[in-house]
Curated annotation (Swiss-Prot):
Function: Has 3'-5' poly(A) exoribonuclease activity for synthetic poly(A) RNA substrate. Catalytic component of the CCR4-NOT complex which is one of the major cellular mRNA deadenylases and is linked to various cellular processes including bulk mRNA degradation, miRNA-mediated repression, translational repression during translational initiation and general transcription regulation. Additional complex functions may be a consequence of its influence on mRNA expression. May be involved in the deadenylation-dependent degradation of mRNAs through the 3'-UTR AU-rich element-mediated mechanism.
Subunit structure: Component of the CCR4-NOT complex; distinct complexes seem to exist that differ in the participation of probably mutually exclusive catalytic subunits; the complex contains two deadenylase subunits, CNOT6 or CNOT6L, and CNOT7 or CNOT8. Interacts with CNOT1, CNOT3, CNOT7, CNOT8 and CNOT9. Interacts with TOB1. Interacts with NANOS2. Interacts with ZFP36. Interacts with ZFP36L2. Interacts with RBM46.
InterPro entries, per the entry: CCR4/nocturin_mRNA_transcr, Deadenylase_CCR4b, Endo/exonu/phosph_ase_sf, Endo/exonuclease/phosphatase, Leu-rich_rpt, Leu-rich_rpt_typical-subtyp, LRR_dom_sf
Similarity comment: family membership: Belongs to the CCR4/nocturin family.
Regulation: Inhibited by free AMP, and with lesser efficiency also by CMP, GMP, UMP, ATP and neomycin.
Encoding gene (name): CNOT6L
Cofactor note: Binds 2 magnesium ions, but the ions interact each with only 1 or 2 residues.
Region (Required for interaction with CNOT1, CNOT3 and CNOT7): 1-152
Molecular function GO terms recorded: 3'-5'-RNA exonuclease activity; metal ion binding; poly(A)-specific ribonuclease activity
Name of protein: CCR4-NOT transcription complex subunit 6-like
LRR repeat spans: 57-78, 80-101, 103-125, 126-148
Natural source organism: Homo sapiens
Amino acids binding substrate: 240, 276, 360, 365, 412, 479, 484
C-alpha cells in the first residue's frame, strides 16, 4: 500500500476572533444540539479539574496565560486535539504522554520555565507548529529549533533518540481450521505472502511516526529475513522486492535454506539504466526444492496486456496501460513424497502440477477500476499458462481446472471491493461501481472466460473456483499504517483441489495499543504489512479405490 503523503493535509488553526452564542431557553426546549469543539480556560488558573480530560471531542484547547506549574499525563486522553496552547504558564516539565497526542498540528509552549523536553514529543509526527520561545532550554535544543525547518529537525532528532523498549513481539497464534485427511491421499504444504516494503518507499515523508534508523534498509532487512525464516514456508510470495536485494540478499539467503526462486521487476526497469534498474521493485516466488520442481516460469506485464486488449478504449490506454505493475507465476511439479507412504495418486506416472501466482496491484484508492482490470488481466493470463501446462506430457487432462492454483497478492483492495468479489465469486458485473462508469465494456470481454463472443449476461467471469485462505475476518488488517488499517493482502486457492488446514493469526491488538504503536513500520515491525501464512492440503485429481469405489472429488 502506498500513501499519498504524510502528514501535510491542509490544517487551519483556530480563529483568534472566535465568537460564541448561548442558546436560548426556547432553543434548548426544542432540542437544539450544542456544538463546541474548542475550549478556553483563563484567569490565572493554577490547577485543572480532572473532568476536563473527559471532553474527548475537543479539537482545540486554550490554556495560555495561567499559572499552571504542571500538566497531568491524563491530557493524552484528549486524542482529538489538533491545537494546544500552553504558553505563558509556569511549566517546568511536560508529561511524556504528550507524545501520544499524535493528532496535534500546533503545540504552543512559549514563555514557560522548560529546561528539558521529553523525547516522546518526537512522536508528534503531524505537528506543524511548535512554539518554544522564552524557555531556558539547552543550547543543543535551541540550535536545532532555530534552524530552517527547525520544528521538523527537532522532532526527528527526538524521535530518533527516543529509547525503544527491548521487549519482543508476542508470537502470533496458529489457528487450526481442519485436521489433515487420514484416509484419502493428500499433500500438505505451507504458503507465505508478504509485502516487505521496498527501501525507496520507506521514507519519513510517508512514515513520519517511525524513527529514521528503523526505516533504514540495513536495519529492516534483518527483521524481514527473520520473519521469512521463522515462518519456514514451503512456498514464499514476496512483493516490493528491490531488484538488487533479490540477487544480493533474498536469493542467496534462501538458497542456503533449500529454496530456488523466480523474480521479475516492474516494467519500468526495461527503460532504465543499469544503475537505476537495481532499485526497481517487483515480485518474487520461492519454493523448497526438496518438495517442488520448477516446470515453467512466467512474467505478466499488465501494461502490455492492456495495450494488446485496449480495443480503442481511451480509459484502458490512459488509466490502465500507464501503470507498470506486474505479476509472476510458476508451474511446479509436486514431489510424490509429499503425499506420504501409501498415499500416492492412482497412476504412478502422473505428475501432480501446481501453479503459484503472485502479483502487486496499483495502490491508488482513486483507481479502483485499474485494480479490478489488472486482476482480471492477471487471472486471464494465468488461465493461458494453465492451459499450456495442462497439455504437457504426463499431465492428467487438458482441463485447466485439473491443475490447482495458489494465488498470492497485495491487491491493494479491501474485502468488499470488486477485486475480491471477482476472485471469490467467479466474476463481477460489467457495470460494477469500481469501474467508475468508464467505457471498458468491449475490451473487458477479452478477459471473460466465455470469450468475446460468448454469453456473459453482463458479467466478466473466470473459470477458476477460488477461495480465500483467510476468511471470516481471521485477520483484522494486513496493512497497518497511521492513515490506513485494513486487509489488502490475500492468499487464494483452488477449492476444488485444496482445503485450508490452518493460518497464522493476527498480532495481539492489545499489544499494539499498550505500546502506542499507531502505525508500521516500527522498530519491532520491519514492514507496513503483516505476513500471511497458511497450510494447505492438496488432493490429487485421481483418487484411489475405497471399498472398490472411486470416490468423487468432494469439493
Amino acid at each position: 500500500m502506498r500513501l499519498i503523503g504524510m502528514p501535510k493535509e491542509k490544517y487551519d488553526p483556530p480563529d483568534p476572533r472566535r465568537i460564541y452564542t448561548i442558546m436560548s431557553a426556547e432553543e434548548v426546549a426544542n432540542g437544539k444540539k450544542s456544538h463546541w469543539a474548542e475550549l478556553e480556560i483563563s484567569g490565572r488558573v493554577r490547577s485543572l479539574s480532572t473532568s476536563l480530560w473527559s471532553l474527548t471531542h475537543l479539537t482545540a484547547l486554550h490554556l495560555n496565560d495561567n499559572y499552571l506549574s504542571r500538566i497531568p499525563p491524563d491530557i493524552a486522553k484528549l486524542h482529538n486535539l489538533v491545537y494546544l496552547d500552553l504558553s505563558s504558564n509556569k511549566l517546568r516539565s511536560l508529561p511524556a504522554e504528550l507524545g501520544n497526542m499524535v493528532s496535534l498540528r500546533e503545540l504552543l509552549l512559549n514563555n514557560n520555565l522548560l529546561r528539558v523536553l521529553p523525547y516522546e514529543l518526537g512522536r508528534l509526527f503531524q505537528l506543524q507548529t511548535l512554539g518554544l520561545k522564552g524557555n531556558p532550554l539547552s543550547q543543543d535544543i535551541l540550535n536545532l529549533y532555530q534552524d530552517p525547518d527547525g520544528t521538523r529537525k527537532l522532532l526527528n532528532f527526538m524521535l530518533d533518540n527516543l529509547a525503544v523498549h527491548p521487549e519482543q513481539l508476542p508470537p502470533r497464534p496458529w489457528i487450526t481450521l481442519k485436521e489433515r485427511d487420514q484416509i484419502l491421499p493428500s499433500a500438505s504444504f505451507t504458503v507465505m505472502c508478504y509485502n516487505v516494503l521496498c527501501d525507496k518507499y520507506a521514507t519519513r515523508q510517508l512514515y513520519g511516526y517511525c524513527p529514521s534508523w528503523a526505516l533504514n534498509w540495513e536495519y529492516r532487512k534483518k527483521g524481514i529475513m527473520e520473519e521469512i525464516v521463522n515462518c519456514d514456508a514451503d512456498i514464499i510470495s514476496l512483493q516490493e522486492v528491490e531488484t538488487e536485494q533479490y540477487f544480493t540478499l533474498f536469493l542467496p539467503a534462501l538458497k542456503e535454506r533449500g529454496y530456488d526462486g523466480f523474480f521479475s521487476p516492474k516494467s519500468r526497469a526495461k527503460i532504465m539504466s543499469e544503475q537505476e534498474r537495481k532499485h526497481v521493485d517487483g515480485c518474487a516466488i520461492f519454493f523448497k526444492t526438496e518438495k517442488f520442481t520448477l516446470v515453467q516460469k512466467h512474467t505478466v506485464e499488465f501494461n502490455q496486456v492492456a495495450m494488446a486488449n485496449s480495443d480503442g478504449s481511451e480509459a484502458m490506454l490512459n488509466r490502465v496501460m500507464t501503470k507498470d505493475n506486474i505479476g509472476v507465476a510458476v508451474v511446479l511439479e509436486v514431489h510424490k513424497e509429499l503425499f506420504g507412504a501409501g498415499m500416492k495418486p492412482i497412476h504412478a506416472a502422473d505428475k501432480q502440477l501446481l501453479i503459484v501466482a503472485n502479483a502487486h496491484m496499483h495502490w491508488d484508492p482513486e483507481y479502483s477500476d485499474v485494480k479490478l482490470i489488472q486482476t482480471m488481466m492477471f487471472v486471464s493470463e494465468v488461465k493461458n499458462i494453465l492451459e499450456k501446462a495442462s497439455s504437457r506430457p504426463g499431465s492428467p487432462t487438458a482441463d485447466p481446472n485439473s491443475i490447482p492454483l495458489v494465488l498470492c497478492a497485495d491487491l491493494n483492495s479491501l474485502p468488499d471491493s470488486g477485486v475480491v468479489e471477482y476472485l471469490s465469486n467467479g466474476g463481477v458485473a460489467d457495470n460494477h461501481k469500481d469501474f467508475k462508469e468508464l467505457r471498458y465494456n468491449e475490451c473487458l470481454m477479452n478477459f471473460s472466460c466465455n470469450g468475446k463472443n460468448g454469453s456473459s449476461e453482463g458479467r466478466i467471469t473466470h473459470g477458476f473456483q477460488l477461495k480465500s485462505a483467510y476468511e471470516n475476518n481471521l485477520m483484522p488488517y494486513t496493512n497497518y499504517t497511521f492513515d490506513f488499517k485494513g486487509v489488502i493482502d490475500y492468499i487464494f486457492y483452488s477449492k476444488t483441489h485444496m482445503n485450508v488446514l490452518g493460518v497464522l493469526g493476527p498480532l495481539d491488538p492489545q499489544w499494539l495499543v499498550e505500546n502506542n504503536i499507531t502505525g508500521c513500520p516500527h522498530p519491532h515491525i520491519p514492514s507496513d504489512h503483516f505476513s500471511l501464512l497458511t497450510q494447505l492440503e492438496l488432493h490429487p485429481p485421481l483418487l484411489p479405490l475405497v471399498n472398490g469405489v472411486h470416490l468423487p472429488n468432494r469439493r
